[in-house]
Swiss-Prot record:
Expressed by the venom duct. It comes from the Eukaryota. It comes from Conus leopardus (Leopard cone). Residues 1-27 form a propeptide. This is Alpha-conotoxin-like Lp1.10. Belongs to the conotoxin A superfamily. The modification Cysteine amide is found at C44. Keywords: Acetylcholine receptor inhibiting toxin, Amidation, Disulfide bond, Ion channel impairing toxin, Neurotoxin, Postsynaptic neurotoxin, Secreted, Toxin. It holds the Pfam family Toxin_8.
Length: 45
């Protein structure tokens, strides 16, 4: 089986624009933090 270049995860971040990566990081950190998640329900789905 041959997988695409980003399928191993090493290059996945390189394919994301920096602001998107920052937003994703903030969202992940916030959504794992109950007070932040409760204060920002729109970003955690």
């Amino acid at each position: 089986v041959v997988l695409g270049p980003a399928s191993d995860g090493r290059n996945a971040a390189a394919n994301v624009k920096a602001p998107d990566l920052i937003a994703l990081t903030v969202r992940n950190d916030c959504c794992h933090n109950a007070p932040c998640r409760n204060n920002h329900p729109g970003i955690c789905g």
